[in-house]
Design a protein with these regions (language model features):
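Conserved beta-hairpin
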Residues: 40-71, 142, 186-207
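Conserved glycine-rich acetyl-CoA-binding loop
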Residues: 221, 225-234
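Acyl-donor-binding surface of acyltransferase catalytic domains
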Residues: 60-64, 68-143
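Structured helix-beta-strand junction loops
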Residues: 30, 34, 96, 191-192
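Short beta-strand micro-motifs in enzyme catalytic cores
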Residues: 55, 127-131, 193-195, 217
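A conserved beta-turn-beta hairpin within the catalytic core of GNAT-like acetyltransferases
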Residues: 74-75, 211-219, 229
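Flexible, substrate/cofactor-facing loop regions flanked by secondary structure
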Residues: 138-217
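Short amphipathic alpha-helix that is part of the acyltransferase structural core
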Residues: 2-37, 136-174
Length: 234
């Protein structure tokens, strides 16, 4: 028997904390590419907020409305009333997330309600394609690209910082001098999720597996050294 949802009142809209991992997995399985960031957490740790680094919200039934609220706010399913309820819940709670991620038809209306309370976004990418391969690539991989070793952290970190500044527009070393970002990058290397091509000790190409479910791996942090661009490395 499914565990009953735990209801919370948010401006007369009932928002519940999801506790049934089976229902969540059914929803995530219907969109394995779009839900990869959430699926990798749920499949490993279930729906316990402490284990997955955030809460899973629903307003009615999980197959009708679902939103992940953690370091990222990720609406996965819902109509206009559901999105409004999720926004009100986020506005009424201490802010945790730094970005909204997901399908534009869900993220953009959610952000329109949040913007008045949270202030202007640093960047709104309303047309950012989500690309996926459904078959093996038609070109051969670069044999020089390999997993990064821990002793190469310093060299790899230089490229990672350049990538972050170019992609996000801010320096990841702000605030704590880069200690937190260094730990994050070191964690990716330790997990075997950081890949690069080195030439004379310098990174000329890098990419990372940010999230990984049993069926989908999300490639992020792709970067090519400026002097090596235009050669097909990317």
């Amino acid at each position: 028997m499914s565990a009953p949802p735990l209801y919370r009142l948010t401006d007369e809209r009932r928002v519940s904390l999801v506790r049934d991992v089976g229902q969540v997995r059914e929803v995530l399985d219907e969109d394995p590419v779009g839900s990869c960031m959430v699926a990798c957490r749920v499949l490993d740790y279930g729906v316990d907020p402490n284990a997955i680094g955030g809460e899973l919200w629903t307003r009615r039934r999980v197959d009708e409305s679902l939103c992940y609220a953690g370091a990222n706010l990720i609406p996965l399913r819902g109509g206009p009333d559901d999105i409004a309820a999720f926004a009100d819940k986020a506005l009424g709670s201490p802010r945790r997330c730094s970005s909204l991620v997901g399908r534009a038809e869900l993220v953009l209306p959610l952000w329109r309600r949040l913007e008045a309370g949270w202030g202007a976004a640093r960047d709104v990418r309303d047309e950012q394609p989500l690309m996926a391969l459904s078959a093996p690539p038609q070109c051969a991989g670069d044999p020089a690209v390999r997993p990064v070793r821990m002793e190469e952290l310093d060299a790899y970190l230089v490229a990672a910082i350049e990538m972050f500044i170019g992609e996000v527009g801010i320096d990841p070393r702000m605030g704590d001098g880069g200690r937190g970002y260094r730990r994050r990058v070191a964690g990716l290397i330790a997990a075997g999720r950081a890949w690069a091509r080195f030439e004379d000790g310098q990174v000329v190409f890098k990419a990372e597996i940010g999230s990984q479910s049993p069926t989908v791996g999300q490639i992020q942090g792709v970067w090519v050294h400026p002097e090596w661009r235009g050669r097909g490395l990317g």
